[in-house]
Structures are given as structure tokens and as C-alpha cells.
Amino acid sequence: MRDGQPLWTCTGCGRTFANRNQTHSCAPLGSVDAHFAGCGPAVRETFDAVLAAVRACGPVDVLPERTRIALHVRMSFAAFMPRRRWLDGHLVLARRIDSPRFRRVEIYSPRNVLHAFRLMVPGEVDAEFTAYLAEAYLVGAQEHLRRGPGTR
């Protein structure tokens, strides 16, 4: 990746991407609030705690898509699917982490590893989880492409 390479903007939906003509579901974005209709208050509070932790890392775009809420810098690095009593989601990290915090790990490439999780209450957005969010934020900013695989 070249430093400062401009993002490509889709003329159909207005989303930005690191790669020109990036394949995506070109659809208008919805609202964050609509994703939480029918959810318990702890679900929204948990998402808000996650979002506050991510915003402490830097600017982030919140993309309320049809089936998920994605967090995006140069690329999407996290996604959330609110359920009635919990918040399902995943982070994209530049390395595999074997932790009971993650329900599933899928390796897409050596520097793009999906880690699925389920959060029940805002208190689970603790120092450990916040560190994972910060690491995922760097992936979203594509900082992981400036370093070797598996390094922070």
C-alpha cells in the first residue's frame, strides 16, 4: 500500500474503498437505530461501549448495512449483528488469537484473520477486548500492511 493513496468512492452508494472498483453490495445505508429495534437495552449499551472504544483509536465510519453494522477506516475491520439479548460480531486482525473470547476464527490470508465473538453486557468491553478493537482498527487503517504478518 502506498502512503496517502486516496480512497475510491463508489458513485452508486457513496462508500469509500481502498481499492478502485471494489466488489461490494452497492445499496443505500440504513440507520443504526433500526438494527436495535426489538433488542434489550444492554445490547445497544454494549455496542455504544464498543464504538466509544473504537473512536478513542481515531476516526471511524459507522456503516449500518442491511444485515450488519460495519466499522470502516480504509477497509471494514469489524461488524456487529445485534440480537435480542446479545451482540454478535467479528473483528479482522492481522494475526490469529486463540482466546475463549472468540467463538470462531477464520483465516482469510496471513494478515486478515476473522475473530467472531458474542458480547452480552457493556462490561465485556474491558481492557482485553479494547486492545483487540485497537488492533483491528489498525487493520482497518491498513497499518498492518506496513509491517510484517503477525506483528503489532
Question: Where on the chain are the PLM-derived regions?
Answer:
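Charge-dense, helix-prone N-terminal extensions
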Residues: M1-R152
